Regions:
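Secretory targeting signatures
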Residues: 1-55, 89-91, 99, 306-333
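Intrinsically disordered, low-complexity boundary segments flanking structured domains
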Residues: 37-38, 108-113, 191-196
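Proline-centered helix-kink/hinge sites
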Residues: 38, 107, 165-166, 312
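N-terminal "domain-start" segment that seeds a small globular fold
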Residues: 44-81
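Alpha-helical scaffolding within the catalytic cores
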Residues: 76-77, 106-107, 149-154
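Local sequence-structure signature of Cys/Sec-based thiol-disulfide redox active-site neighborhoods
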Residues: 78-128
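Flexible loop/turn segments at secondary-structure boundaries
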Residues: 101, 130-132, 177
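Short, conserved sequence motifs used for protein processing/export or organelle targeting and
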Residues: 134-174, 178-308
Length: 333
């Protein structure tokens, strides 16, 4: 005799009203567990984030740089090439000679731990607009900061200032403003931001930067290769003119010597080319450096309806879908 083993659903022996309640209870329990898990995950992720993301009209953005050339009066030409793995971590700083908190935050930056073989490039924007005590800034440098980081800054401080000293930007992506710490210390905040690095893979990038000075005419040529990036990326290169150190004993924060001073900015129209221009001279001395950098932007369209829903909301959405499914199943029974 052939016997068949039947799989019997134990809910069949439960009265229908109780079955419905059990199904609904199941949905409620699952929804609760998913929400708790999502909130814990979100909280853990938020705890690791010690910065404010830079806001852009594009979904993702950052700044990378750079290839450096010393503009020494004893030289007439210089060329340097850099591959992606050699690009330094970039820290842009908004500061002023009267800003005492800037001294504290800069000392913290100087104490950061850097892996062997890696490096940091620091660029200091000095306040210029409505400024009477700081001689280092310029209209171009202040405009650059406000255009690039002003919106993020305004939304990140209670005064809604677009250019607040001290401020730090890591890799053109992550803003730290003032001296308020998110973790146990500013050092941990900055170190976490530094360790994160650029959000795009730069290992295949390369850049060549050249300068010649013939009869006082400065000619620059450059080539930036980012072949690994798709056509959804936009690259906007520029040359920064940086003074290594300026002496200003009248500074209100008592520093006297100020380093990494951004003196001028020259926007470039393409990822390769050449240009001749005059740049702002050093405040004092003969210690200017030209640096090739670029802003990158990624236009990331919405990835459908589900992709546009924040994670906790998507959990609720899925749970409601399950509840509707159960309700329809119950109505058919």
């Amino acid at each position: 005799m052939h016997l068949e083993i039947l799989a019997i659903n134990p809910l069949l022996f439960v009265l229908k009203p109780f079955r419905i309640n059990m199904n609904r209870s199941f949905v409620v329990v699952v929804t609760f567990l998913l929400l708790v898990t999502s909130q814990q995950t979100a909280a853990q992720s938020e705890n690791l984030k010690t910065w404010n993301d830079v806001i852009s009209e594009y979904s993702d953005t950052g700044t990378l740089g750079g290839v450096s050339i010393p503009l020494d009066s004893n030289l007439t030409n210089y060329t340097d090439t850099m591959t992606g793995d050699e690009w330094p971590s970039l820290i842009e700083v908004y500061t002023a000679t009267w800003c005492t908190n800037c001294v504290t935050t800069q000392n913290t930056i100087d104490s950061l731990s850097i892996p062997e073989g890696d490096s940091i490039m620091k660029i200091h924007y000095h306040r210029f607009i409505a400024e009477t005590q700081d001689p280092f800034g310029s209209q171009k440098t202040d405009d650059r900061w406000i255009d690039r980081y002003g919106t993020t800054s305004r939304l990140s401080n209670i005064y809604e200032y677009q250019n607040l000293a001290p401020s730090k930007i890591f890799d053109g992506e992550r803003l730290h403003i003032g001296t308020t710490k998110t973790s146990d210390s500013l050092a941990i905040d900055y170190q976490t931001s530094l360790d994160k690095g650029p959000s795009i893979d730069i290992s295949s990038f390369s850049a060549t930067f050249s300068w010649t000075n013939i009869s006082g005419v400065n000619d620059f040529s450059w080539n930036i290769s980012t072949n690994s990036l798709s056509n959804k990326y936009t690259i906007e290169p520029m040359i920064f003119i940086i003074e290594d150190e300026g002496y200003f004993p009248e500074g209100g924060n008592g520093e006297k010597y100020y380093r990494h001073i951004l003196r001028d900015i020259i926007p470039l129209s393409s990822v390769d080319g050449n240009i001749s221009f005059d740049y702002n001279i050093a405040y004092d001395g003969d210690d200017l450096t030209a640096v090739l950098l670029f802003d990158w932007f990624f236009d990331n369209p919405e990835e459908g309806f589900a992709g546009a829903i924040p994670f906790p909301s998507s959990v609720i959405f899925v749970s409601l879908f399950i509840a509707i499914f159960f309700s329809r199943s119950e109505n058919k029974q």
